[in-house]
């Protein structure tokens, strides 16, 4: 066996052992996860059609250990360790990192809220994401093109501390700060996020803010030593702006449920801010407007659809601003509480121009990509279609 396999086996066996002994201390450790796989078709993937296996579409394939110990007085010690993997190869989702998705520990109190520390999702994602199209139609085909606004699960933050308030009259607030960890440069590589949510009956609304400061090194946002830890989404939409000194994301989304019908609207504004060492000079802005609807026809069968329109700014020598229009559909059928069959279809059309990977002076036609399933495999035409059919099992 390889070392990663041995580590996984030890963790699973340890979890099973803890689960049988933890009851004496009024605590629990739960092993959970998802296995998800599909057959995917793309009409144009860098100039060629492709039929291939793709895992983690409805839900990312993963397993985790979740712990909770009752300390008394309404206070609990909690932790969550979550690892992603490729179901088709058995490989870790991120080489060299076991718990790449999240790994945190903290305290939760019913009166005072929750404090957690470790590698975590941002309040921006945790609050706004559930009301966005990526939650209802999957990130693979439902995330806004390239997941440009991070409303799918692409950004995970190292060295972070998060506080989440209790819920008062439907309102919940959360804030995160992540240390960059660069000696002598406290303003580089760090991350800040805050979000507010209101949920009451059929109405759910959230707004969030996220700022990621670059490490200042040649690796920029892909520097594994800094807060964003290489989890920042890279696609043909933003590859010309990865030398930015910082990225700011603001988003708001809301859902309204009427019986079996749910409708939603969402908006995001993303800015790539240039610095002294950036390969572009003007702030690049992406505004995305989205709408969604989902209907449960029976307790086991549901359908969802979404539309997104992303408009980039006209700057850095670009004469015609890039535009992306995406149409997404999802059909799902539950065989049981744990097993779901699903089908996904999406089409993205692009127009205008953007910067290529070399930055300013390298202007290229904006290439279409569907959701976050084709990040660096765009169509060579102005349109890209993706279809998938798969199965997901939770445990």
Language-model-derived ranges and their functions:
Residues 55-58, 95-97, 153-155, 186-188, ...:
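Short sequence motifs at beta-strands and strand-loop junctions characteristic
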């Amino acid at each position: 066996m390889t070392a990663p396999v041995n580590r996984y086996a030890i963790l699973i066996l340890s979890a099973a052992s803890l689960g049988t002994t933890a009851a004496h201390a009024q605590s629990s450790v739960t092993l959970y996860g998802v296995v998800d796989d599909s057959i995917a078709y793309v009409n144009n993937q860098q100039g060629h059609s492709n039929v291939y296996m793709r895992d983690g579409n409805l839900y990312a394939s993963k397993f985790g250990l979740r712990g909770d110990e009752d300390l008394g007085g309404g206070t609990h010690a909690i932790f969550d360790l979550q690892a992603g993997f490729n179901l088709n190869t058995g490989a870790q989702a991120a080489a060299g990192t076991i718990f790449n998705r999240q790994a945190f520990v903290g305290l939760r109190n019913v009166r005072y809220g929750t404090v957690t520390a470790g590698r975590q999702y941002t309040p921006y994602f945790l609050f706004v994401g559930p009301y966005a199209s990526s939650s209802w139609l999957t990130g693979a085909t439902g995330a806004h093109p390239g997941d440009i606004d991070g409303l799918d699960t692409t950004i995970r933050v190292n060295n972070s501390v998060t506080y989440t308030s209790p819920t008062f009259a439907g309102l919940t607030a959360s804030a995160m700060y992540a240390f960059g960890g660069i000696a002598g440069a406290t303003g580089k590589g760090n991350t800040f996020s805050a979000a507010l949510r209101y949920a009451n009956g059929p109405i759910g609304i959230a707004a969030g803010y996220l700022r990621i400061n670059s490490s200042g090194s040649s690796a920029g946002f892909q520097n594994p030593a800094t807060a964003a830890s290489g989890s920042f989404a890279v696609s043909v939409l933003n590859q010309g702006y990865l030398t930015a000194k910082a990225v700011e994301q603001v988003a708001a989304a809301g859902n309204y449920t009427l019986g079996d019908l749910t409708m939603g609207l969402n908006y995001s504004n993303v800015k790539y801010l240039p610095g002294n060492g950036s390969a572009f000079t003007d702030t690049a802005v992406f505004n995305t407007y989205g709408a969604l609807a989902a209907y449960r026809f029976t307790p086991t069968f549901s359908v969802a659809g979404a539309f997104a329109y992303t408009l980039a700014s006209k700057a850095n020598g670009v004469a015609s601003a890039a535009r992306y229009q995406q149409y997404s559909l999802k059909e799902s059928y539950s065989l049981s509480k744990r097993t779901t069959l699903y089908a996904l279809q999406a089409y993205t059309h692009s127009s205008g121009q953007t910067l290529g990977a070399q930055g300013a002076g390298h202007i290229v036609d904006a290439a279409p990509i569907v959701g976050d399933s084709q990040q660096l495999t765009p169509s060579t035409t102005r349109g890209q279609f993706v279809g998938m059919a798969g199965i997901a099992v939770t445990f």
